[in-house]
Amino acid sequence: MMSLSTTLKPLSHFSPFVKRHNPKTNNTLFTLDTHNFTNSFWSKRGGSVSHRKHTVVAVYEAPDHVESSWRRLLSEVVVVRTKRSFWERSWTSWDVSKLVIFVGTHLLSLLAPFYFSWEAFWVFPWLVFINGICITLSYHRNLSHRSFDLPKWLEYLFAYGGVLAFQGDPIEWVSNHRYHHKHCETQRDPHSPTQGFWFSHMAWIFDTSSILENCGGEENVDDLVRQPFYRFLQRTVLLHMMAYSFLFYFCGGMPLLVWGIGITIAVRLHLTFLVNSVCHIWGTRAWNTSDFSKNNWWVAILTLGEGWHNNHHAFEFSARHGLEWWQLDITWCLIRFLEAIGLATNVKLPTETQMKGKALV
């Protein structure tokens, strides 16, 4: 954390952020001015800024060609708009493939009223739950953060379920997420909220070239790349999605395709996206982290515990995100069950000392 000079001036009379130049990178830094913000915002919301120490909670780094910036409503996040348009770039074939899948599932979901059947309808909530578990338990807590270990057969089973959630292969997903934690809320963050709500929510997934340019390749996932199973999934991920869709159509016709693929995938995508967007903008903070991650109770309910995002950013290694007894974390309940029957081992949790060291209160 760094101290903030009292001579710096805020961006505007209502903004708690200060704009200053970084000569080393020739970039602009947006830093939190605790003098004009502590009493007006954090004192009401139990934030982590100390008025006495003038602590900076987070530092945003942006190119100098910033077009405009503003603070998000009811949040301390500053949105930085640059002149580079989303469309003024080259699209890779993988970007186009993801856009086709995204638009296709959403268009398919619009057919739901015309292909309603109770049999297909009841498939929808169960698949949303199963797909969600495979993403939160496997892609996120097991593969991205190694919060616990599973037997290889079970690890691979959950990971394959993540592929069928239409969120890409494990190597790409885990790589992006690890870069998110490494460069959180900076220009190198794959889905920084400083680039706007919709960018952090979903637009970022169609810009793989930018991630490659800002973060690098997949050298941060050597543990997965070394395994033939994950390389196989990376090469064939589209084939699995197509086969999965054809299976639903073969078993239940258009009703099952619409409800089991269209609505299920569209809903699950946006539930996952809420963690990237909403949970870095709105909510409460319990821990002193170098970002604006938030705990959001309603997102936590919808995402099987992922909404306790400030908890997660404070203790990335923790298999449990709902650290309080009242913080519902369905994914953690399943991990505990797997641990109880001997399938989940080396389950990591923060110690009392670690929690006291980061607690705001």
From Swiss-Prot:
Alphabetical UniProt keywords: Chloroplast, Fatty acid biosynthesis, Fatty acid metabolism, Iron, Lipid biosynthesis, Lipid metabolism, Membrane, Oxidoreductase, Plastid, Transit peptide, Transmembrane, Transmembrane helix
What range is the organelle transit peptide? Answer: 1-57
| Gene Ontology terms describing biological process | unsaturated fatty acid biosynthetic process
Q: What is its EC number?
A: 1.14.19.-
Give the pathway: Lipid metabolism; polyunsaturated fatty acid biosynthesis
Q: Where is this motif: Histidine box-3?
A: 309-313
Motif Histidine box-1: where in chain? 140-145
The disruption phenotype is:
No visible phenotype and wild-type levels of both Hexadeca 7,10,13-trienoic acid (16:3(7Z,10Z,13Z)) and leaf chlorophyll content.
Indicate how the chain sits in the lipid bilayer. Answer: Multi-pass membrane protein
| The keyword Iron is annotated on this UniProt entry | yes
Q: Which InterPro entries match?
A: Acyl-CoA_DS, FA_desaturase_dom
CDD domains for this protein: Delta9-FADS-like
Provide the primary localization: plastid
Any single GO molecular-function term of the entry would be: oxidoreductase activity, acting on paired donors, with oxidation of a pair of donors resulting in the reduction of molecular oxygen to two molecules of water
Highest rank taxon of the organism: Eukaryota
Family, similarity comment: Belongs to the fatty acid desaturase type 1 family.
Any further remarks?
Answer: ADS3.2 does not contribute to the FAD5 phenotype.
In its UniProt entry, what is this protein called? Answer: Probable lipid desaturase ADS3.2, chloroplastic
Question: What species is this protein from?
Answer: Arabidopsis thaliana
